[in-house]
């Protein structure tokens, strides 16, 4: 029996929401919905490469760099030190919200330790993604310069936002980094590079004053809020399977997208008590290249893509779609430790006579499922290794995805429009069974069921109700 751990509006002071797949799980809907109960919403990773699409009071909003809490009046919003900032894009996003009547004056704070995304970073990213031939390193990024920015960060040559508070020093740092990056990547001629540098210096000189008042020690700010017992919300970008260390490497993003990334990304102590919420879409999607064991290429793909409106907010690319992969979800749960789950877009599956869930992988040749903990072993270059992965294990290397295929559990569909249903108990029994099977497989209580069209069904321990 799965423990029914529920979100307590009174006692759960610190909340974290993070994606359990390759991003695009629908995190923004729950963040926006719950943010009204919180004093501060902080984002701990990513940059303007991610995208959130939300509806609030009938108006559609598209966010990239900013936390979803910006849509909630009086809520403070933080971009932590784990976020990378492209100044022009951020200002454009702020101006766009202002035109829609949302003023972020005195509501947005940005870490002085956040690294800057330069236009040259974006040019390098675009160059890498356009490479052709045998030695191409293309992985399907958004071409927003996030990878090159984090690369310079790791090389200790990047520039933090706080450096702009001392213009003379910033000018030296930007000049040095620009010529160094171009020397390494050979993107521009010397004359074009000089023009780019002058243009970028002018942009920063003109625009930084617009957000200078927002730049501060956000780590101290968040720590202070937590100590004072205020309600703080942590928002992650992307999804756990895109994590640099634990995702489907190298087809990953360049930051830590897992729950553990919140500590470094915001500068808070691991001792802080956090209710961790995992967001899981009722089926699987992915943008860009990389392994996707349950990917569909038939009419079922067309149905999922069309009815789920699976188009990337940032790039406009059509998302790849497939059945829900519970093996990957269990893998993510193992290192994330989510207390509760928010299941999204359940209504998109209403069109199917039957639905499938991947519960295991089997070898394409031998047909053996991934559950062998004992021999047979085999040798490779005098090294012994297991021929089969044990049950519940997710492959570590991309080549392993080519050797295995999904094992599905088929469940009857519900063929009923559930978009207007207001309680979990109103859902067709087959839909309820689908939710309960996921819950039992993962061993985590599904506290919210989000419908793509309208509602969020909220499951209490004894009663099930809808939050409007």
Swiss-Prot record:
Keywords: Cytoplasm, GTP-binding, Ligase, Magnesium, Metal-binding, Nucleotide-binding, Purine biosynthesis. Its cofactor is Mg(2+). It catalyses: IMP + L-aspartate + GTP = N(6)-(1,2-dicarboxyethyl)-AMP + GDP + phosphate + 2 H(+). SUPFAM superfamilies: P-loop containing nucleoside triphosphate hydrolases (SSF52540). The active site is at residues 24, 52. InterPro entries: Adenylosuccin_syn_GTP-bd, Adenylosuccinate_synth_dom1, Adenylosuccinate_synth_dom2, Adenylosuccinate_synth_dom3, Adenylosuccinate_synthetase, P-loop_NTPase. One of its GO terms (molecular function) is adenylosuccinate synthase activity. Mg(2+) binds at residues 24, 51. Substrate binds at residues 313-319. CDD domains: AdSS. It is an enzyme of class 6 (ligase). It is found in: Cytoplasm. GO terms for biological process: 'de novo' AMP biosynthetic process; IMP metabolic process. GTP binds at residues 23-29, 51-53, 319, 345-347. Binds 1 Mg(2+) ion per subunit. Homodimer. Belongs to the adenylosuccinate synthetase family. This is Adenylosuccinate synthetase. It comes from Theileria annulata.
